[in-house]
Each structure stands twice: as structure tokens, then as C-alpha cells.
């Protein structure tokens, strides 16, 4: 497993990785026959996407960074859509000033040193408000981390998605027109729709603002997940997304937080100190950050987006405290 991690990490960071959710990857790009030496290696969303998230941004990944590159977006009628274009490294990004309309066609055009390039996409029906917020209460949704787009740490998403062996369950515990409360749980490794009763539940301490119905964001809170069979702490876990019109799914789900790398040292940097993983990723320009507990710069920022969380029929999240887990004989050895 250690050699898999190192080989994969080197390959993905050095070469740019593989296809991400809803993105296209041309494997390094091609040069323009007119003589332009730059090219587009990936876009997000993919050209022709028919179910884009209504709060999505647009990204064009270039072979070579261009500080002056820009993106403009128009709707199906050709009207300009307000937004901000920016460049981070070799990625040109555009974010809308307001959420896009549901079930609407858009075209994004990149202007850079080569000829302008465009992609087209259509948003899904997600975006219309839930008529009765209370109808969401009791619904449980399964969030599959392995199916998301790993935005951070950059370049190593394929490795993390291959090692994350569990998902997250989210239950709506109360909801009204302005706020929504949720409780989370780590899913069992054997069944992504079942709760791991030997792990404490994620008790988000603050209700989420639901004034942008159907969009919500809940958290932050701390939890533990399994990576290659090792328990890893995630600090400041926050989850966001938007409910589908009939409440049977959460679309555009995103998860963010910071992951403690120290338990991964035996897998990735055997024989090294607490900073073994951080030293390795630093050689590829990926910095570790200070952990939330103040113990040192041993954590990596984690962000996963573009997930769909389907409702679990008959699902139920049972609140579990540390004492519950400790006193449960079936949890011995966990």
C-alpha cells in the first residue's frame, strides 16, 4: 500500500491527474495547428454536460499558465451572465455573481493566446425552492466521497478517492423557511447506506442558513473517517448542497475541512517523523497547514465537490456519543 501511495502521488502531481467529476481531461493537451503553443487540457463542466449544478463555476485548465486569460458566459439567448473571471496557476476560473437559472443552457468562452474556445452546458432542474421545508425532516442522504471532484489537495484527488473507504450520512432533523439543522454520521464500510455505530455522530452545532432555499451549508464540526483502514481526523468539516425539487437528493454537494496527515505517515513516509507526509507533498508545491488543535502544520486542506447524495429509503441516523461507543461491546477494538 505504501508503494501505491507514493507512486500514485508522484504520477498524479507531476502529470496533472485524471478526469474529475463532470470534467474532461485531454491527457496534457494538444498544440494549436496555427502555431499557438498553449492548449486546453481540461474543462469543468465538461462540454455538453446536461445536468450541471446551478451554482457551478467554470474552469479551463491550460497547458501553460496565462495571467491575462479570461472567461465570459452567456445564456441560451446570448445574454451575458454576470460573473468574475480569475486565474490561479494554469487554471482559468469564472464564478457567477448570482446562482444560475435551473434547466437553462449556457455557453462559456475562454479568451487566451490561442483562438477563443467555448463549451456549452445545461443546468439541471435543481434550483427551484422546496415548497414545504418541513417535508425534508427525517430524510437521510448518503454522500459518496469517492464520487466527488477533489479540488484540494490539488493533483492528488485520484489517490484520496481510492483510499477513502467510507461515505457520510446526513439526516435533516428540523427545517423551516430560514434554517435547517442536520446530524451526520460516518457510513459503514460494508454498506454506504448504513451508519457505522462505532463512530461518534457529527453533531453540527449551528443550524444552517436556509434562506437561499434549496441551498444550504452546515458546519463546521469535527469527525473521523477511514483512509486505507486508518482513522483520520477531519477538522472544521462543512457540507453544502441544494435539495432536488422533490427532496429525494442533494445535488452539487461539497465537503470541506482539513485532514490530519500524521496517521498516514506509516503508509506514505515510513520511518519519518510527524511531518513525513507534509515533507513529501511539499516537494510538489502542496503546503500543509496548521491543524485546528494548534499542534502544528501537519494538516492538508480538503475540498470535495460535485457530489450527488441520494436519499436513503427508510434511513435513520442514530445519535452516538463517545460514551455510547466506548460502552458498546460490539465496538471493541475500533
Segments the model singles out, each with a brief description of its role:
Residues 126-334:
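Extracytosolic secretory-pathway proteins
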Residues 2, 19-22, 55, 88-90, ...:
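Surface-exposed charge patches in extracellular/virion surface proteins
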Residues 8-11, 23, 27, 83-85, ...:
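Small side chains
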Residues 1-8:
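Sec-dependent signal peptide recognition
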Residues 8, 12-34, 331-334:
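Ser/Thr-rich, Pro/Gly/Ala-heavy low-complexity intrinsically disordered linkers and tails
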Residues 18-19, 39, 48, 76, ...:
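Small disulfide-bonded, cysteine-rich extracellular recognition modules and tandem repeats
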Residues 34-130:
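Acidic, low-complexity Ser/Thr/Gly/Pro-rich repeat segments typical of extracellular/periplasmic
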